[in-house]
Amino acid sequence: MEDFVRQCFNPMIVELAEKAMKEYGEDLKIETNKFAAICTHLEVCFMYSDFHFINEQGESIMVELDDPNALLKHRFEIIEGRDRTMAWTVVNSICNTTGAEKPKFLPDLYDYKENRFIEIGVTRREVHIYYLEKANKIKSENTHIHIFSFTGEEMATKADYTLDEESRARIKTRLFTIRQEMANRGLWDSFVSPKEAKKQLKKDLKSQGQCAGLPTKVSRRTSPALRILEPMWMDSNRTATLRASFLKCPKK
């Protein structure tokens, strides 16, 4: 799984995931499924915000090629991936500027067009189950929830999907590609099932001669949100940098 992640995700996303796991004492060589899940969630957050801007008239537009002469503002503020202190600083600044209610938990994005925080979910299970879990945890009508699955399903608060169909289709296609490439490598079952993940982990460690003394239980604890965001993600060049990660994963 680790090799798969390094092959199929943008190196910057991999680096952010590595830093996040290290910060919280998680070993990516053991928690490989978590490593893949963090990378996937972070990529979806960036794909969600990518290409979307607000023009001088306050209208939401899509721009795939940056025009240095255009006075555009990113429609979405990315909160996911920042260190905790900076993330809350950004949230507080948004609340002070817009009058939005401060969320209890750190959200993933802020939508300047709709003036609301957004929580993004990527699930290997039924979308409605994961949506209810998110809603029960957040317990706030002011944070918009949008859930994607690897099967192309999605669910959002009040069926308001925020993005246009083309943008959402791009995210769904990427998730479906990840699923297919995992399946081609025999990794999908272990990614979905903790029981299968345990078997795969023991098999991998045994083949490396590292099985002794290592845990055999796979943690089901939810990973904390990524806390580190490189400055490059917020500049005008992030579109070009991310574009490489939309490509199909290379096959072995």
Curated annotation (Swiss-Prot):
Residues annotated as the enzyme's active site: 80, 108
Important for efficient shutoff activity, annotated site positions: 28, 65, 202-203, 206
Localization, UniProt: Host cytoplasm; Host nucleus
Pfam families named among the record's database cross-references: Flu_PA
GO MF annotation terms: RNA binding
GO biological process per UniProt: viral RNA genome replication; viral translational frameshifting
Site positions per UniProt: Important for efficient shutoff activity and nuclear localization: 195, 198-199
Main localisation: host cell
Keywords carried by this UniProt record: Decay of host mRNAs by virus, Eukaryotic host gene expression shutoff by virus, Host cytoplasm, Host gene expression shutoff by virus, Host mRNA suppression by virus, Host nucleus, Host-virus interaction
Function: Plays a major role in the shutoff of the host protein expression by cleaving mRNAs probably via an endonuclease activity. This host shutoff allows the virus to escape from the host antiviral response. Hijacks host RNA splicing machinery to selectively target host RNAs containing introns for destruction. This may explain the preferential degradation of RNAs that have undergone co- or post-transcriptional processing.
Entry text on domains: The probable endonuclease active site in the N-terminus and the basic amino acid cluster in the C-terminus are important for the shutoff activity. The C-terminus acts as a nuclear localization signal. The C-terminus is recruited to host protein complexes involved in nuclear Pol II RNA processing.
Family to which this protein belongs: Belongs to the influenza viruses PA-X family.
Record-given protein name: Protein PA-X
Originating species: Influenza A virus (strain A/Korea/426/1968 H2N2)
